[in-house]
Amino acid sequence: MTKSFFGGIWHDRYILASFVNRDLQARYRRSLLGVLWAIITPLALSIIIGTVYAVLFNQDIKVTIPILFAGLNPWTFITASAGGGNTAFINAEGYLKQLSVNPQIFPLRTVCIGFINLLYSMMAFYVLYLVLQPQAFGAEMLMVVPGLLIMFVFCWGFAQIASVANL
């Protein structure tokens, strides 16, 4: 069962890559800033909310904003994966009727799109962290990589469950 599941996804990997690429291009096509929206939106939200929290609760703004940004990025990815997985088969109805592809690529498609946006915003997080707290920036920051992979697998499973539950 596992071999056929992953084998089907591996067999349709080029279709999956094409869908992800096309969805990302369509998402940012008519935008003046393009992919920068994936960076600017969580960054601006973190700066605004972090500034308000720092003033209201008398906290150091250099600590509050990176912590808020570090929590907002994964949360945005999880909610995008769950929401996209919930409607993955409904949105792909036309493809499922016309093409002979593994249907499990459609929830994975939404998770891949969210993960790419997460990687963009993580780059902004590292730059922000380097600017606000350069003394705390070190090799231990690389420990986020295994965490991102675990979160990708979790969100993929969650999107699979949500997509099947919504049929």
Region annotations inferred by a language model:
Residues 1-167:
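Hydrophobic transmembrane alpha-helices and immediately adjacent juxtamembrane helices
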